[in-house]
């Protein structure tokens, strides 16, 4: 196959209401949440950031300009995670595109637990869908 570019986000699902921005393991939960929200009439754009270094700011900003809402989803702790960097990007360069506050769905501010407890630590598709629904209340 072809090597993946290191500076490109991938739009896995096009949408018009909410941008779900994520990477790694949380992509699957974002896609599940997008399916559930579609049944409620909410159209989610799912963006796979893919590489955190050489961040594709253009794709993220264009998506949020289109949807006006962003949920950043990561499995890392909420504070000092890379999601905060994306939130800062939206505050600095995409503020006037936002119709609602940026929401971050992340792990707890603690160390990653043992595997048997991981499901209690990691955000879920339900958490992602809940955050997106809350953003839809802004208009």
Can you say where each PLM-predicted feature lies in the sequence?
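Thiamine diphosphate
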Residues: 1-139
């Amino acid at each position: 196959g072809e090597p993946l570019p290191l500076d490109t986000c991938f739009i896995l699902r096009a949408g018009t209401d909410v941008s779900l921005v994520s990477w790694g393991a949380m992509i699957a939960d974002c896609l599940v949440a997008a399916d559930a929200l579609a049944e409620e009439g909410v159209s989610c754009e799912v963006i796979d950031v893919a590489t955190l270094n050489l961040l594709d700011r253009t794709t993220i900003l264009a998506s949020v300009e289109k949807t006006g809402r962003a949920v950043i989803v990561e499995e890392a702790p909420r504070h000092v995670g890379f999601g905060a960097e994306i939130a800062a990007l939206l505050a600095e360069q995409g503020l006037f595109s936002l119709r609602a506050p940026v929401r971050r769905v992340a792990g707890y501010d603690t160390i990653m637990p043992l595997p048997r407890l991981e499901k209690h630590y990691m955000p879920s598709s339900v958490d992602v869908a809940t955050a997106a629904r809350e953003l839809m209340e802004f208009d």
